[in-house]
């Protein structure tokens, strides 16, 4: 057998015909398969929007912001990459047009281009190229780079031109391009139509890129004759035309991709050393996904529920918590405003087994979150609060148990007489409008110390110190901690190691079986194969409540 190449390989994933085809999930599935074949894989997303990062974007437009360990605010696809690869990525995994142009303009202002006329080619493409190539370290066998947007978009052109240049510079044998296209079904004629894919590939060729494989997204099985036609008309091997119909679960996609032979085709074309796919961990996951022993109804009480992608990592973490308990988690999406009154909360939450209060910003919907927390506390329904969810638990305890009826957060009422939640000291200028909003929160991984005998210490398997990712500007006001503990019985069960910042709160188990919250975003570190303990604990409490154990 000839020796295999030791050069880091690049796989680029592009999309055609329509957006939201699942490029990120397909790329993640391919990455998972290559990792399961013994290869070292990292992933990256190129986003063509002009924002520097998604940190200031409307959740209704963009979905969630995924925060990495190093505090970068990134695209939600980075979350898919981490969950499928079971690998922590950093800020370099997300490149935006805004970042690229900001860097190039800053270099021009410093005179680094020595008087050159700064242009898209070569200056912008060189900067993109640098950000792609720096992923290819000695510890990496394969870099998978997803190109955001759709072939034909004006915004994507510099990225696609860069892909062409990378292929030219590192060698065609070291680069593989996967093009994902929609294969629409026309009901009246009963036909799958190949023409949109042909036109999409033609547009890609016009830029100078010939795809090596085509993934067909469709809602049904694809006949061999259709694959042969696309192979002929798009000039790819028939073995490289891959059908990827809609799956019951996103975690079924790797099996589909493998069944079509894409991963085997890729490793052979790129001359990569490989072994057979090790399915041990993934098969156990799929068994838990499709053969649950229990089913629970869980209410996710939020303000952005019209776009579920705004809570993507939360919903995946909740489902993973179900996998840990062999339970199917059926999510009931509840608009927080519907829980403002006791009657509204009872109507929305009376039939659920657990509740999750996720993060958010601004005062809209907060009174409903507080109402949902009160209902959960009074009816002993397991509840997990995340970020703003913790702050709302503190506000509810202050108002209803500690006799501070006007307790509030300075985020919602800057003139409140009882700011039980207040602005972090280093955030005062930003909140006052004297600093940039983007990239200035408390971001990234921070440690916490858990109290002995607490519920959170128990669910974290007895660990005294844990680390979680954060994204917030406000904190529990320490001036009220003693009063809340004494009057409301709320326990501050986890703090920063110096004791100054509240990181976890809970009620004692004899008061409530599982009313727990964290100032962090633990959903960002959950994996389908390694569920996060806080979510697993929530589902466990819900199963016990439902089964009476």
UniProtKB/Swiss-Prot annotation:
This is CTP synthase. Homotetramer. Catalyzes the ATP-dependent amination of UTP to CTP with either L-glutamine or ammonia as the source of nitrogen. Regulates intracellular CTP levels through interactions with the four ribonucleotide triphosphates. Pathway: Pyrimidine metabolism; CTP biosynthesis via de novo pathway; CTP from UDP: step 2/2. GO terms for cellular component: cytosol. Residues 297-548 form the Glutamine amidotransferase type-1 domain. Its EC number is 6.3.4.2. The active site is at residues 387, 521, 523. Keywords: ATP-binding, Glutamine amidotransferase, Ligase, Magnesium, Metal-binding, Nucleotide-binding, Pyrimidine biosynthesis. L-glutamine binds at residues 360, 388-391, 411, 473. It comes from Streptomyces avermitilis (strain ATCC 31267 / DSM 46492 / JCM 5070 / NBRC 14893 / NCIMB 12804 / NRRL 8165 / MA-4680). It comes from the Bacteria. It is an enzyme of class 6 (ligase). HAMAP family: PyrG (MF_01227). InterPro entries: Class_I_gatase-like, CTP_synthase, CTP_synthase_N, GATASE, GATase1_CTP_Synthase, P-loop_NTPase. ATP binds at residues 20-25, 77.
């Amino acid at each position: 057998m000839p020796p295999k190449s030791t050069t880091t390989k690049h796989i680029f994933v592009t999309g055609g015909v329509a957006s939201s085809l699942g490029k990120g999930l397909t790329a993640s599935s391919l990455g998972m398969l290559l990792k399961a074949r013994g290869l070292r894989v990292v992933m990256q997303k190129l986003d063509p929007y002009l924002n520097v990062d998604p940190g200031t974007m409307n959740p209704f437009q963009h979905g969630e912001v995924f925060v990495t360990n190093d505090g970068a605010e990134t695209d939600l696809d980075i979350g898919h990459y981490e969950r499928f690869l079971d690998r922590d990525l950093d800020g370099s995994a997300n490149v935006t047009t805004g970042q690229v142009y900001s860097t190039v303009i800053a270099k021009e202002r410093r005179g680094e281009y020595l008087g050159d006329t700064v242009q898209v080619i070569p200056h912008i493409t060189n900067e993109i190229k640098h950000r792609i190539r720096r992923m290819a370290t000695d510890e990496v066998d394969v870099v998978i780079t997803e190109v955001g947007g759709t072939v034909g978009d004006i915004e994507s052109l510099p990225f696609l031109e860069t892909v062409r240049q990378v292929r030219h510079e590192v060698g065609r044998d070291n680069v593989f391009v996967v093009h994902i296209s929609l294969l629409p079904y026309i009901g009246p004629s009963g036909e799958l139509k190949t023409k949109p894919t042909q036109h999409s590939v033609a547009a890609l060729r016009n830029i100078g890129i010939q795809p090596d494989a085509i993934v067909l997204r469709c809602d049904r099985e694809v006949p061999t004759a259709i694959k042969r036609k696309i192979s002929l008309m798009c000039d790819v091997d028939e073995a490289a035309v891959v059908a990827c119909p809609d799956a019951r679960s996103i975690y079924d996609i790797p099996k589909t991709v493998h069944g079509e032979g894409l991963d085997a085709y890729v490793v052979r074309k790129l001359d990569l050393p490989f072994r057979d796919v090790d399915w041990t961990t993934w098969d156990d996951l799929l068994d838990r996904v499709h053969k649950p022993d229990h089913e629970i109804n869980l209410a996710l009480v939020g303000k952005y529920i019209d776009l579920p992608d705004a809570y993507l990592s939360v919903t995946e973490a909740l489902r993973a918590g179900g996998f840990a308990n062999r339970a199917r988690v059926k999510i009931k999406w509840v608009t927080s405003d519907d829980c403002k009154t006791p009657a509204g909360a009872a109507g929305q939450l009376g039939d659920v087994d657990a509740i999750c209060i996720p993060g958010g910003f601004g005062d809209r919907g907060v009174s409903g979150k507080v109402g949902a927390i009160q209902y959960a506390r009074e009816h002993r329904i397991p509840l997990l609060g995340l970020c703003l969810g913790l702050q709302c638990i503190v506000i509810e305890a202050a108002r209803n148990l500690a006799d501070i009826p006007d307790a509030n957060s300075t985020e919602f009422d800057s003139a409140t007489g009882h700011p039980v939640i207040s602005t972090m000291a280093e955030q005062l200028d930003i909140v006052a409008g004297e600093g940039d909003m983007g990239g200035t929160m408390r971001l990234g991984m921070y440690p916490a110390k858990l109290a002995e005998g607490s519920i959170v210490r128990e669910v974290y398997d007895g660990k005294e110190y844990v680390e979680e990712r954060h994204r917030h500007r406000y904190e529990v006001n320490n001036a009220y901690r003693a009063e809340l503990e004494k009057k409301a019985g709320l326990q501050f069960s986890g703090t920063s190691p110096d004791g100054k910042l509240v990181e976890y709160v809970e009620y004692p188990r004899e008061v409530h079986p599982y009313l727990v919250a964290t100032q962090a975003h633990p959903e960002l570190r959950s994996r389908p194969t390694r569920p996060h303990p806080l979510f697993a604990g929530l589902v466990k409490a819900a199963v016990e409540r439902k089964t009476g154990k």
